[in-house]
Curated annotation (Swiss-Prot):
Lineage: Eukaryota, Viridiplantae, Chlorophyta, Mamiellophyceae, Mamiellales
Location, primary (coarse class): plastid
Job description of the protein: Essential for the assembly of the photosystem I (PSI) complex. May act as a chaperone-like factor to guide the assembly of the PSI subunits.
Organism: Ostreococcus tauri
Sequence intervals crossing the membrane: none
Keyword Nucleus: no
Stated family: Belongs to the Ycf3 family.
Annotated SMART domains: TPR (SM00028)
Name of the protein in question: Photosystem I assembly protein Ycf3
UniProt GO cellular component terms: chloroplast thylakoid membrane
Record's bilayer topology term: Peripheral membrane protein
Length: 166
C-alpha cells in the first residue's frame, strides 16, 4: 500500500486528497503522475523521520521526473535528509544540483549558507581564523542571495549579516 494511503495526519490526508484530484484533472503524463506519487510519499516518509524510505521514494521520483524545476525540489529534499544526518558535504552536492535546475530556490541558498556558517564556527573554535573568515564570507554570499529572493524571510541571517558587518 502506498504511504499516501496510510497517512494518519489530517494535513497529510488533505494534501493527498487535493493532490489526487489535481492529478486526475490536470493534463499530465502517466510518468509525471507516478513521479509525483513517489515524491509525495517521499515527503511523507521524510516528515516522519523515515529517511531511508524517503530516499527510495525520491530515487523513484527522480527516475520518472523529467522537468528540471520539479527535479529541483527532489534534489532539495534529498539535501535536507543529508543535512539532518550530518552529511553536510553530500547535502551541499544536492543543494547545488537543486540550484542548477532552479536558481530561484531561496531555501536551498539558505541551507548552503547555514552549512558554511556551521563550518565557519567549527574552524573558529579550532583556532583557524583565516578559514573561518572564508567560510563566513561564503555563508554571507548565499544568505544575501536568499534574502534578495525572499526579503521577508531569514530574519536571523539578516541580523547576523548586520551585526557582523557583512
Amino acid at each position: 500500500m502506498p504511504r499516501s494511503q496510510k497517512n494518519d495526519n489530517f494535513i497529510d490526508k488533505t494534501f493527498t486528497v487535493v493532490a489526487d484530484i489535481l492529478l486526475k484533472v490536470l493534463p499530465t503524463t502517466r510518468n509525471e503522475k507516478e513521479a509525483f506519487v513517489y515524491y509525495r510519499d517521499g515527503m511523507s516518509a521524510q516528515a516522519e523521520g523515515e529517511y531511508a524510505e524517503a530516499l527510495q521514494n525520491y530515487a523513484q521520483a527522480m527516475r520518472l521526473e523529467v522537468d528540471p524545476y520539479d527535479r529541483s525540489f527532489i534534489f532539495y529534499n534529498i539535501g535536507l535528509i543529508h543535512t539532518s544526518n550530518g552529511e553536510h558535504t553530500k547535502a551541499l552536492e544536492y543543494y547545488y544540483q537543486a540550484l542548477d535546475r532552479n536558481p530561484s530556490l531561496p531555501q536551498a541558498l539558505n541551507n548552503i549558507a547555514v552549512i558554511y556558517h556551521y563550518r565557519g564556527e567549527q574552524a573558529l573554535a579550532a583556532g583557524n581564523i583565516p578559514d573561518s573568515e572564508t567560510l563566513f564570507e561564503k555563508a554571507a554570499e548565499y544568505w544575501k542571495e536568499a534574502i534578495r529572493l525572499a526579503p521577508l524571510n531569514y530574519s536571523e541571517a539578516q541580523n547576523w549579516l548586520q551585526t557582523t558587518g557583512r
